[in-house]
Amino acid sequence: MGNTNTVYRLGPGCEVDDIAEGQIYLGKVQGFATFGTFILLNDRVKGLLHKSNVKSEKKERDQILVQVNQIRPNGNIDLREVTLPEDSYETQLVTKKITLSRLADLKNKIGRNVTIEADVVQIKQTSGPTIFTICDDSGVEDAAAFTEAGVRSYPEVNLGDVVRVFGEATRRNNQMQIEVSDMHVLKGTEADAVRARINKALEARAEPPEDVVPLIESDVLSALWPEMRKLAKIIRRAVLTQQPIILRHHADADGICAAVSVETAVMQYIRDNGGDPDQDNYLFRRSPSKAPFYEIEDVTRDLDMMLKDNVRFGQKLPLILLMDNGSTEEDMPSYKMTEVYQLDVVVADHHHPDETIDKYLLAHVNPYHVGGDFGVTAGMLGTEIARLINPAVEQKILHFPAVAGVADRSEAPELGAYLSLIDGKYTKDECKDMALALDYEQYWLRFNDGREIVKDILNLNNAPDRHNRLVTLLVTEANAAIEDQMNTMMPHVKDQVLVSGANLFLADVEMFAHRFTFPPPGKSSGEVHDILCKRYENQPVVTLGLGPDFAVIRSRGVRMNIPQMVRSMRDEMPGAGISGGGHLVVGSIKFVEGMRSEVIEKMIEKISEFPADLQ
């Protein structure tokens, strides 16, 4: 045999086709029979060492050198024992002659052994097997590995590893799955090559369709389109890689329209591109926020839930999508929390942006970035982004921009264009009714998303009769509550004329309004403002809804900059605890109750400095 012999060690995944007659292999004793000894060459190939070919006494699990005498047509392997001094041979690993399969092709290979190279995107330990969710360049599927009930298989495999999986393609509960016979982690250049291949494919699959363009003619939307495509691509990629998505949105009609449009697109995209039919329930969560910014309370809740899911279910940390909030300086504390956990954050908002927060964001869609303003509402942005994520939902959500626009009292030309799109299907008054119904129902939902109720209000459930009856009921109840509130508040509204010529009105929403019911202070202030705007037609009007430690600001015909005013007041009144912001002409301010009189006085002084558009 020469001075140095070669002994082959059969690698994982190798089969009978990978061995050759006459060669020597390193094996392991599996068991004994009267006619000989069974030898394992790896976890799936074994042969028979006839008792006439045994040269030494062995125990179960002992290593042994064997030569392949014959491979029979039925696959049985005849072996004979070989004894060699340890220093007279070298060991060479036999690797599987790999023919890689793609996850998308498993349905055509049921019952056959496959080899997959993929990224581990989730690891879930069940009471039986360990379920590895893996993602390659074609899709996502589960790989089930069993050691013993409830025991973690392949503990060396971690979330984010690139692995080579060997196993049988099966179908379980109408879902494709790989029954794992072996799995090992790829390292170095081998892993890098697989990652590069997967990333290249994901980049192409995540790219929004090129033929999707804005629904209407709009310079603002056209200028924003590249950033909207970027944001949509990030969302599509999150779905393709099984990254959970948390969608946080302002809990008003505009924010709801923005969020539900994206929710509708993403849920369908998840169902079209995933393995587990229930995964849309745990890969996507929509949560309303009371404030028009990402509060510490909200980010803390999100962090608590996402970290528990990461530990318990082996999920990736999520992508956070903020809609109708997320653009202002007030979001900064929450963004610092997301930075600690290296979370991906994207924003689609129409509040006046603060450039200091952009360093925390992967994408930021905001009309102010391209010379627009808050008239291009979050619901308009959300609908266009939803179409980029999944164009198939377009007809379902075509009325959302109009509902959002009338809800936020948009005066932008885009609103008229969106209303014309649904001419003959919904009137402007019907859009207003849906907007009011959303505001009314969300008030009672508090922090719950009310997914199915909201879908009924927006006529997404293919139940038009129920939609009409529900909206009519909610609008009737809401209008009755608003009328009662206005009858209570209006006699107590105080007025004065500012040096700028603007009419200023003070409405105390604490002392002269029903509390803890609909409409809340912000909505009540807006309704008072609407009445006063009609009463003082073509005149500049500013309305302050005053609470014990807050003020709601509504204005028309005054060139205000509320975020700038808040910053100025905070600098000038360090003991007042001032915070707040919003749009340029619509917003709110918080302060400490003990400084209420001084803050109101300073606020009136600041508002007087803004020029009024006098007729």
Write out the residue ranges for each language-model feature.
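Single-stranded RNA-binding regions, centering on S1/OB-family and related RNA-binding modules
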Residues: 1-117, 122, 126-130, 136-154, ...
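Short beta-alpha connecting loops at secondary-structure transitions
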Residues: 50, 142-143, 362-372, 384, ...
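An N-terminal, well-structured beta->alpha segment
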Residues: 199-243, 247, 256, 264-268
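Gly-rich Lys/Arg/Thr-decorated short loops/hinges at beta-loop-alpha junctions or inter-strand turns
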Residues: 207-218, 278-287, 506
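A structured phosphate/pyrophosphate-recognition subdomain
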Residues: 240-247, 251-253, 355-511, 528-529, ...
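Flexible glycine/proline-rich, aromatic-decorated loop/lid segments
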Residues: 346-347, 351-366, 561-575
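Glycine-rich, acidic loop segments that terminate in or are immediately followed by a histidine
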Residues: 391, 498, 503-615
